[in-house]
Amino acid sequence: MCTLLTILTILSSFLTNLETKTLQSDFIVTVAEEVNAPMNYPGELTMHGQCFKVEMFNIEAAYDGKTMYMYSPETDELTLTNPTEQELLESNPLLYAKALVPVCNIVERTSQDGSQTIVTLTPKDQTIGINRFVLKIRNSDLMPLSVEIKEGKKTSTLKMKEPKFVQGAKEAYVITPEKDTYVNDMRL
C-alpha cells in the first residue's frame, strides 16, 4: 500500500499525461445491470486534455474544447452543442478521474504481479451520482488500462486495448459533415 501522498502523486502524474499527451486506444465498454445480461460496445478513443474523439459502431462523438459533435451514421445527422460538465464526463469516463479526486476517499492497491496500480475513488458525498470509480494504471508509463464506474445497480467498465501516446492534431477533435449530412446546431 502507498501513502496518500504517493497515490496523489501517481494520480497527478497520470492526469498530467492526459493533459499534455495524446492518448489513443481501441476499447470495449461493458455495461452490466443487475437484471440484464452485460452488453459490450467496442470503439476507439483519441484524447488530449479535455478534447476527445470517440468512435463506436453507431455513433461518433468529439469535443474540441468548446463544441460537442455527435454524429449518427444511421440518421446521417450531426448535432452540435455546448456541453455541460456532466455531459462531458458521461461522454469520456477518463475525465471523471480529474473531477472526482477532490471529493472522494482514495484507496490504492497494487495488482498481484505488481505491474498496475489500482486506484478506487469513493465519493464522500453520495449526491455525486456514482458509488465507486476504479482506475487501473500501468506502472511503467502511467497508461490507463481500465475504468470502472458503479452507479446504483449499473456498472460500466471501459477496458483499453493497447493504449499508447501518439502525435495528435487539434483537427482530430472535430467532425466535419459530408455535403448531405443534416446538421442540427443547438449551440447557444
Where are the language model's segments positioned?
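Short, surface-exposed coil-to-beta transition loops
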Residues: 38-42, 55-57, 64-65, 128-133, ...
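N-terminal leader/targeting segments and the immediate start of mature chains
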Residues: 1-39, 46-51, 126, 171, ...
